[in-house]
Amino acid sequence: ASAALEEDKVFADEVFYDSGYVKIKDRTIKNWTSRPYGSLTFRKAVEESVNTVFVQVANRLGAETFRKYIEAFGYGSKTGIEIPGEAEGIIYPLSKTGEVELATMSFGQSISVTPLQMINSVAAIANEGKLLKPTLIKEIWDYKGNIIHRHEKEEVKASVSPLPASKVMDL
């Protein structure tokens, strides 16, 4: 949603039509409810998680722009949290992202992300589009109770600008 709002490819109150499914090549993609919603705004499509609308919006963005935002939100790379064993997740290479892959990635399939990446990307929206490095440690104290180290917020990158982030918060 934020990528499409940032790129002016969709507006919150723009009306879409959902027939309950969309054909992409030889695949039929349905909504999770398997029912059509008819006419609905983008805002309502986000609220109801309407797969077919996300497919339409991803097609407006295109694979290259869609991938740019996936990476901007930290998917496909480690967050840098201070614990071992963190996974990067799995994202199709751009060269292998066809129409079907783009369509299914638009609503969260054909992509593998970690719970920490998901939380961090949602936090980026709440932080006015800034993707921050997550941490488990706020501060370190010595045995007398003195703070010897305080973790400062570290911005990894801007995922989207503040205006689209606030629009997503309003959805």
Protein language model regions, located:
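Beta-lactam-recognizing serine transpeptidase/beta-lactamase-like catalytic domain environment
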Residues: A3-L171
